[in-house]
Amino acid sequence: MKINREEYLEYITFGEFERPLFVELFGPLVGLPEEWRQQGATEEEINLTAFGFDFVKQHVVQANPWLMGGLTEVVLEDTPEYILTRDSLGRTLKLIKSSASIPLPLDYPVTEMDSWLKIKPLYTYSEQRFTDGWLEAAKQARSQGDLICAWIPGGFDEPRQLMGDENLCYAYYEDPELIHDIMNTLGDTSFRVWDKVSREIEIDHLSVHEDMAGKSGSLIGPVQIDEFVKPYYLKTWNLLRERGTPGTFGRIPMAI
């Protein structure tokens, strides 16, 4: 069942709501929507609204706190067994067709401070991070009962995209200056983007694209979270909370 932003916010902040929400967490795996379409599925079936799950329609403000620019993504090699591509960061990615749905990087652009400084401009703030008409689109969505959402890159996930899991985990100990500079850059850009937006319209929900899970537990310990990740999260979260964003911070698995 579709619920509006007021109902969602009432529920998520422990207000009055007649029943628990029933949601599907992640949706179809990569590649399934295309397969289902070929089999005749409707768009409502593909986005799962046809099956009785609760959902709130979200509007992500058209502003970009992520990497902006970079290389043109190209296919380097396509064989029956795998696909090799080059992404916007310059990484070589390999997708094994028989056993994977997400390509894995074979190399990474950041190994030390000099290599980070070469791509750092892709993460710094500029007015070009705002799509024309972003405010009008957000106001229209709000008037239709949509949840107004902001996103920030993950405090672990984005550095791991730049460095890889192993190199990042070593760098926390061997090159903390590098990690602090990456986090400060991400934090400054996210803060300035959502500072400008929240002066014009209230954000309902701040989400973070995070992934620090390993097979046996977190890939990062509490000491590293306290030093590197927590200050980054709080920089934007405290801003939005002071501007009226309710106590909602995380991912929105039920939103479409």
Predicted regions and their residues:
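Active-site loop segments of alpha/beta catalytic cores
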Residues: 1-39, 83-86, 95-96, 113-256
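A structural signal for short, hydrophobic beta-strand segments that form beta-sheets
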Residues: 72-77
